A protein has these predicted regions:
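Extended alpha-helical scaffold and adjacent linker segments that couple domains
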Residues: 1-281
Length: 281
């Protein structure tokens, strides 16, 4: 325990030397104080409440300061974020976090994870029933221009902000003209894409560094990272489901006017009805 206390003190001392934002250091100290209180969830809102020291505080300005402080602390690996939970990092945890962030991953791994989340976890089917004739129709699954499995006549492509032409909405729309596919464009979400990358980096780092030669402290951190990644994946699925339900749909050269849905699969099924009607009039 004394060793851990010393390590934490070193983290605080280092932060005081390296950070110019004095409020960020205060937030870091508060996160240290609640690090081992399992019943206190360190969400942005709870941290914001914890840091109020004046009943007349301007809440909007205060929350902006909290936002800025947490961004600084996360970017410099003094804290880690998993979903909406922020956690103080000890020296060893900080070292591992920085090594994870510096782990190289390729674009194919990102596209593969997006496919697993959107098609395998949310849509879950490789056929969708057309309600007019009760017939099931196969479709090709595509993410950001990459297709998976054998190509079928009908095509469902999901576009994320990882796509090279994401900003060119007119181009995406024009690609559907005269085609037998539809495109669902997710709203830009930097947090989602950052968490996708962190999930892949964490899994790769943990796999590369597990083994009998690992120091006990690092082995413990790796085990915690692995458990946190399970939670991260669940959060990614929730975020993706919401984004898919709110996505823009393009088919046959036009934008399909549809109501948003709380459920991504429902949105896809409803849009698919329109696609089948256009392709097989």
């Amino acid at each position: 325990r004394n060793e851990l206390r010393g390590e934490i003190q070193q983290s605080i001392i280092l932060a005081e030397k390296q950070l110019d934002d004095r409020f960020a250091i205060k937030v870091l100290k508060a996160l240290f104080l609640v690090k081992y209180f399992g019943n206190f969830k360190t969400t942005k809102r709870n941290i914001s409440v914890l840091m109020i020291d004046d009943i007349n505080v301007d809440l909007k300005a205060h929350e902006t300061k909290i936002d800025t402080a947490l961004t600084i602390l996360e970017n410099q690996s003094y804290v880690q974020r998993n979903g909406d939970i922020f956690e103080f990092l000890t020296d060893d945890e900080k070292d591992v976090e920085e090594e994870i962030k510096n782990t190289d991953i390729d674009e194919q791994a990102i596209t593969q994870l997006l496919k697993e989340i959107l098609f395998d976890e949310i849509i879950r089917d490789n056929k969708i029933k057309y309600l007019e004739n009760k017939q099931d129709y196969d479709f090709t699954s595509k993410i950001d221009g990459s297709f998976f499995g054998r190509e079928k006549e009908l095509e469902i492509e999901i576009i994320t902000d990882n796509y090279q032409d994401y900003e060119n909405e007119a181009f995406i729309q024009s690609q559907t003209m005269g085609s037998t596919g539809m495109k669902l464009v997710l709203a830009s979400n930097a947090t989602f894409m950052r968490d996708v990358r962190m999930y892949i980096k964490t899994a790769k780092y943990e796999m590369q560094n597990r083994g009998s030669g690992t120091r006990p402290q690092v082995a413990r951190i790796l085990q915690e990272k692995s458990m946190q990644n399970v939670t991260r994946k669940k959060n990614l699925i929730l975020m993706a489901n919401k984004a898919l339900g709110e996505s823009k749909v393009y088919l046959n050269g036009g934008k399909l006017e549809m109501t948003t849905s709380n459920d991504g699969k429902t949105k896809v099924i409803n849009a698919f009805q329109k696609l089948v009607a256009v392709v097989y009039p």
